[in-house]
Amino acid sequence: MAAKDIRFGEDARTRMVRGVNVLANAVKATLGPKGRNVVLEKSFGAPTITKDGVSVAKEIELADKFENMGAQMVKEVASKTNDNAGDGTTTATVLAQALIREGAKAVAAGMNPMDLKRGIDQAVKAAVVELKNISKPTTDDKAIAQVGTISANSDESIGNIIAEAMKKVGKEGVITVEEGSGLENELDVVEGMQFDRGYLSPYFINNQQSQSADLDDPFILLHDKKISNVRDLLPVLEGVAKAGKPLLIVAEEVEGEALATLVVNTIRGIVKVVAVKAPGFGDRRKAMLEDMAVLTGGTVISEEVGLALEKATIKDLGRAKKVQVSKENTTIIDGAGDSAAIESRVGQIKTQIEDTSSDYDREKLQERVAKLAGGVAVIKVGASTEIEMKEKKARVEDALHATRAAVEEGVVPGGGVALVRALVAVGNLTGANEDQTHGIQIALRAMEAPLREIVANAGEEPSVILNKVKEGTGNYGYNAANGEFGDMVEFGILDPTKVTRSALQNAASIAGLMITTEAMVADAPKKDEPAMPAGGGMGGMGGMDF
């Protein structure tokens, strides 16, 4: 086992705080509408330019191991806030720095670290309650667009495109972000349920222009096994032919004689049929077939529930207004399922989302909710260079997370104002002893830090602006973008409550751990081995003169 280097007390905390300051100073330069860019070196290719706090934090590793520990703990604050709320990483870092710096000073002055921590926790708990009190639910598209705009570093086009996407696919809908091919941002919306399986034979195509098979008001047969014998399909095909409607078959596989017969029937115009493979594999395939059954008001023909394909009738089939099948995708639009049954199914999947511990499973379950509840929107990010594309895509993803958080817990006035209002409301708190009361004061002072940093980045005097904001009430604050005072909500400067709350709670959690740290252990630096002695020179070659 390698030898360890151990630091105690003040020496340990001083080094840790030094690391915190290095990371926080780099991250906080990006805060606010007039925040600066940070350039990150890459091992190959052009450097990355970003205004995203968590991207900056992730790049920082310090040479001194004790300083690096401090930096990594604050990095944890940024990452945790990003995971919880999707944004607010820079705010969380600024809060953590302020709490740690003041807390370390108090410990150095002889105060009890545990009492300081209790005081900080007490103040944060009261501030979170106050944040929830001043929070307002987001009900309209305008508020959603404003939240997205602020999170995307005041880029209105991003805020508007996210609001439009949410309007089209609903609050539960899946919105994905991809790299586009143009210069402008684009929005593609797929309404209804889409899955990534196309037609099994090109002979099913009936729309030559789009090279797709379009079915209007079709019946939908859902089967969880292979179909190779056409006799099994005859009762269903006869019923559909009598009704004069097209048919979509979704099964594990349609092959051989069955597929050939369906193609011949389609070409001759007897019955318009399209066959596709069922999406997914194993249990996920069964679940997705059940989703389709609920959406279309049909039944999955499965031996597990005692239904055989040859016994199936037209009553077991689902319905939809329209189905479009391309080479790679199938889209079911406006299924005829019962809305109460769909809601119940969505609720069931949401329960599974809460219970699962796998990120992959959670993502797949959320996709299923979206397909049942609304649809899927794809935001294609446009930019003129690859560097700009990466930076812009990161901002769009941030803004999307922030708007989801706003829909979840509502919004508070932005620009650091919500924390200032919360600290004024809980300003008369006192602890059980003097040290706890000092801990409360540290937390209250730290809650001013985000506003101070936004103002400093805008080139103004933080204390002057802060006092003026404190004199106001409610949503009154400072718009750093244009230097005006006024109602932050009217200015469109909003923060999701969840983002502000998570930033404060995570910063307090890490600050409490750091203040109460008394020893730090790291690997001792290895001593450099002495270099090999230089080799002797080659002997002269006698008798040769130059």
Curated annotation (Swiss-Prot):
It catalyses: ATP + H2O + a folded polypeptide = ADP + phosphate + an unfolded polypeptide. InterPro entries: Chaperonin_Cpn60_CS, Cpn60/GroEL, Cpn60/GroEL/TCP-1, GroEL-like_apical_dom_sf, GROEL-like_equatorial_sf, TCP-1-like_intermed_sf. CDD domains: GroEL. It comes from the Bacteria. Residues 534-546 have a biased composition (Gly residues). Residues 526-546 are annotated as: Disordered. It is an enzyme of class 5 (isomerase). The keyword Magnesium does not apply. It is found in: Cytoplasm. GO terms for cellular component: cytoplasm. Its EC number is 5.6.1.7. Keywords: ATP-binding, Chaperone, Cytoplasm, Isomerase, Nucleotide-binding. GO terms for biological process: protein refolding. It holds the Pfam family Cpn60_TCP1. ATP binds at residues 30-33, 51, 87-91, 415, 479-481, 495. Its main location: cytoplasm. SUPFAM superfamilies: GroEL apical domain-like, GroEL equatorial domain-like, GroEL-intermediate domain like. The keyword Cytoplasm applies. GO terms for molecular function: ATP binding; ATP-dependent protein folding chaperone; isomerase activity; unfolded protein binding. Forms a cylinder of 14 subunits composed of two heptameric rings stacked back-to-back. Interacts with the co-chaperonin GroES. Belongs to the chaperonin (HSP60) family. Together with its co-chaperonin GroES, plays an essential role in assisting protein folding. The GroEL-GroES system forms a nano-cage that allows encapsulation of the non-native substrate proteins and provides a physical environment optimized to promote and accelerate protein folding. This is Chaperonin GroEL.
